[in-house]
Amino acid sequence: MHPMEVRLRHALKTLSLFLVFLLSATAPLLALPAPMDDAELMEKSHLVALVRVLSVGCTSVTKDEQSGEELPGYLATLQVLEVKKGDVKPGDELMVTWRAIPTGIIGPWVVYYYPGEEVWTHLTKRSGGVTYASTSWNARGELVKPAQITKLPIKVGESVTITSKPKE
């Protein structure tokens, strides 16, 4: 085989491997949804409210199929402070669920809630249930008050709760 042919084959193999690597690395990013604008968030949400996060508990730990990482599932109790949309009133409490995402994922593609914080949020009611979920990964709005606790539990049955509820 001519030396030029050998170099050309080597270059093509290297380029092919690089393209396979590039496509496999960016494929998960291509599947992520675009952020919803304010109008779409309002339209698709069952509830838009200012809430105070009272507690967060770890309800499950499941292995992620792609990363193999053990990821906690959470249940937060939120107290409604103000309502822009929805059938709840100030003082009502509701539950929101979410699952952590693998640490290697770019973005935060999930909304986390931390005890003590007061934040505007957009939620959808889970079908057939009593809990809510974030409408989109960008459903978290303006932070009105920072969290008292920023480390969430990672073992099933553990929970973190604010020390006291401020008086209305």
Model regions: which residues?
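Bacterial N-terminal signal peptides that target proteins for export
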Residues: 4-16
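Bacterial N-terminal signal peptides
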Residues: 14-26
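Transition segments tied to proteolytic processing and entry into folded domains
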Residues: 26-168
